[in-house]
Amino acid sequence: MINIALLGLGRIGIMHGKNLMRNKEFKLKYVYDINKKLTNKISKVLKSSPIHNPSIAFKDKEIDAIFIASTTSTHIKFILEAVKYKKAIFCEKPLDLNINKIDNCKKKIKLEKVN
């Protein structure tokens, strides 16, 4: 079983969350969105624990992967935090709107050898 934290609960995040929930190989342990009411509501739909600080997911040793579906401006920040804690990463596109930030992020991922 692969334990996952989903960050971002907009339309695409909810869609990915429902898909993850249907797959028995995954456990959607945490959901997070900047909107606390939405986090609480969607956590019930996705049968997962709501968190109101994404660092909880990064620091949890049981979390194997971080699924990033938040706004584009948060992607690099969340990716680098996942890299720091050696989590596997899935990030919705685009990674960022700045190619230099993307290149720097890519270098850090290669250095840390995460997925």
PLM ranges: what are they?
Residues 107-115:
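Basic phosphate/pyrophosphate-binding loop/patch that engages nucleotide-derived ligands
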Residues 26, 87, 114-115:
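Short, well-ordered coil/turn segments that N-cap beta-strands
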